[in-house]
Amino acid sequence: MRPATQTVSLTQSPQDTILVIKLTPNHQKVSTTMEYEHITHSFEPIYNEDSEILILGTLPSVKSRENNFYYGHKQNRFWKLLAKLCKEETPQTIEEKTSMLLRHHIAIWDVIQSCDIKGSSDSSIKNVTPTDLNQILNHCRIRQIYANGNKAGALYKKYQKPLTERDILVLPSTSPANAAWSLDRLYEKWSEILR
């Protein structure tokens, strides 16, 4: 017989989600909904003076922040896809990932320095402070900027393009939320970054 649950609701401001916590009689948490959290980007950009391609995401996901590196969710296809494009084995460690990027003249960073977000949901992003991309653009010869997904592209166009005066090409997101795109379809579209 399943234990009965007790629901406790805490109401936030009208635009925020109501936090619902279900407790079993022994007070174990069963499930919760997400509420807004203010996140500040904690990773340095990956680049060197030989970088030619810049790939921008939005902001590290919850799993990425837990793993202390970009694209840290095990179902995100970024590292598997990039390895396939570079004709290498999929890197496992931060050092291997960084080394692969730099060997292939690829820089990565994100468009958001800080924002309010629910979990890892890009659609919930608000109150954005953008990153200063000149940190990269002034120190290497970036020939093309790519967005990993529509949200990264839209945020770049809104916040960074007026300052950089550089166009961005939007590629389909490698996020597990973009399940409509198989790894093969992503490979076909992303292959332009190494042309």
What are these regions (language model features)?
Residues 63-124:
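Short, surface-exposed acidic-centric catalytic microdomains
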Residues 20, 33-52, 74, 121-134, ...:
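C-terminal capping/extension of enzyme domains
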Residues 152-156:
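Short, well-ordered alpha-helical microsegments
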Residues 10, 19, 27-28:
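Short hydrophobic targeting helices and cationic amphipathic motifs
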Residues 6, 15, 28-29:
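Charged/polar low-complexity intrinsically disordered segments
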Residues 103-151:
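Internal catalytic-core helix/loop-beta-alpha segment
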Residues 52-58:
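Short, hydrophobic/glycine-enriched beta-strand segments
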